[in-house]
Amino acid sequence: MLPIAILAGGLATRLRPITEKIPKALVGIAGKPFIVHQLDLLKRQGIEHVVLCVGYLGEMIHDLVGKGDRFDLQIEYSYDGPVLLGTGGSLKKALPLLGDSFFVLYGDSYLDCDYKKVQAAFEMNGKPALMTILRNEDRWDKSNILYQDGRIMKYDKKHLTPHMKYIDYGLSVLSKDIFTGIDKESVFDLAELYKDVVDTGRMASYEVSERFYEIGSRQGIKEISRLLEPKIMNMDGHQREERQDE
């Protein structure tokens, strides 16, 4: 399996005051820091090598996760430094740790799709980038992709139109070549690069059917907490949720 970069360096201002003293990756979900759930999922998916792109309070993530022994993963770190580089700049800086091609996952996303099939689609297509997409129709968040005839025709998070029925699922596979010409310490959003790659016809797509979960909002935290709460058996043999204290 390809290595995976997790973008976990943001300030998470939407979750204040929760994230005033901890990074978003350490927000408690169903009794564990979110990143523990995320790494457990990646291990189940066959991932072996993880690069954590960290910035704000990144040392706290390192202190918890370490080199990944408890997860049976190889984990390395790429630090933004004194200036936060944005999702794109942070990933650009991490390239020496990632090899020629790699998965990319946002640090607040829990995406339980088939990663092996996503990688196979990337390798079969031959384009330097692949984005997983979901037919969303504004259900889970605002749709930002115009998708027609098996192709991403337009990707734009700022200028949405009613014709956009799909959304960027949150998992991509990228070749390092799409970063050619971008300075190592550049500050930019990965969505800006994605838009350019789509506009120049270099972005492949892979449609998934599983919904995404995220901890970027309080509603998202409630939804993923319900998903991951431990289950216990009722007297009649049916599962019920073991509720956690809020």
Indicate residue ranges for each PLM-predicted region.
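Conserved N-terminal catalytic core of the sugar/cofactor nucleotidyltransferase
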Residues: P3-I6, K32-Y106, K117, K184-E185, ...
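Conserved beta-strand segments of alpha/beta enzyme cores
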Residues: A25, Q74-E76, P128, R202-A204
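N-terminal nucleotide-binding beta1-loop-alpha1 segment
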Residues: M1-E20, Q45
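Catalytic-core segments of class I nucleotidyltransferases/pyrophosphorylases
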Residues: F102-F103, Y110, K116-E123, E137-R139, ...
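A short, conserved acidic/glycine-rich loop-to-beta-strand motif
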Residues: N125-R135
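Active-site metal-binding loops of divalent metal-dependent hydrolases
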Residues: L11, D108-S109
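Short catalytic helix/loop segments, enriched in acidic residues and glycine
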Residues: K21-V36
